[in-house]
């Protein structure tokens, strides 16, 4: 989902710099909207690196760029005003971005073509809270093509592509999101998606659990009509399991994060490319010979390590899990404690989904020019809040890059940055009683179906089992071919 670091500005040798990048930021909020808090989050926090390369990403209307979207009166060409985006005039640019994304998302386009006539989501009213990027827009438009009505907001205050949000609003999707939301804006947008007259959701698609949390806290009666929750992230899945353990989960929930297609393709392969893309775009750093520590050796961490090692970086790992630590050792990486190596590192990357993985004390000890980058789900992995202190100075140096300057001159730049469709179809169409009030993994048959949708794009041809072979292996010829515990 919908990743980066930053160039050090040349200084005298005595001046220290640390570079900080946050690639897949997800905030943890505990406050709810207040009128006074609408602009409570400083604008000096930079935008997500999920920006497109195209002119659309840099398109702005200078006449109202500083105006909060909540204060604007906007309508699309059909006269609808049931949305709140940065600038509806960006829709044409966003449409180009979505069309480009469609070319690389053959599985969703194939699903759209195969199931469009059946309309398996006819009657579904889906409220979604995810990153709003061109890729997510392809998912949303697929859900609409399959019969669903959608209302959407962003799970991340930094990652929304404004032009894509405008394009979705232009075709009638009720979108409430823009890049650089304040904390109050974030909750206001979620509330506008859920609390609307004459429309009540019966499905939830969440990334991080904030939407689910908001509905539980403010509108628990909504769950009387909700058929299920689909959760995409490890953080959100963890929150669902906590609800289930406490006996408070009142609808079935589908854990998409742990599906094979999500784990391998989104978490491993996509992160393997996006880490380099983000770092290169913002720093032009040469990785050969750089000392890098990656915190966490899950699928995201594995992808980052593979990419960095291939470019000649010297990579070590921090891990709490002995199995993942052993995997790292067998893959040729040294397993260390962050406190042991923090002074020598050129790059620090967090991929855990936990909190306080990199503390203020460790930030203070980092060498000048160190790049600090979050590839995990939550921006609490790095103690950014502690950097908002009187003794530190924030300085905007260029678009998407702020320098945070220590009293001794040290500084770092700061930038904060689909199996889901099948899961929605499965939960929405499941007969009553199939799923109880618990958290479920995507059925392996559906996971394999998602994978099969991608294969034509690679001109891949599956070998078919003979009846004798299928009997010998104890498998159905049409699958599933892996047990449910396979990851």
Region roles according to the model:
Residues 1-55:
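Long, low-complexity intrinsically disordered regions in eukaryotic nuclear regulators
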Residues 2, 19, 49-54, 61-70, ...:
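Adenosine-phosphate binding glycine-rich loop
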Residues 16, 20, 27-30, 36-37, ...:
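Rossmann-fold NAD(P)-binding glycine/threonine-rich loop
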Residues 61, 75-121, 152-290:
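Glycine/serine-rich phosphate-binding loop and adjoining beta1-alpha1 elements at the start
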Residues 129-148, 263-266, 270-355:
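Glycine-rich phosphate/diphosphate-binding loop of Rossmann-like nucleotide-binding domains
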Residues 156, 320-321, 378:
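Residues in the short beta-alpha loop(s) of Rossmann-like NAD(P)-binding domains
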Residues 198, 202-205, 209, 331-388, ...:
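Rossmann-like NAD(P)-binding element
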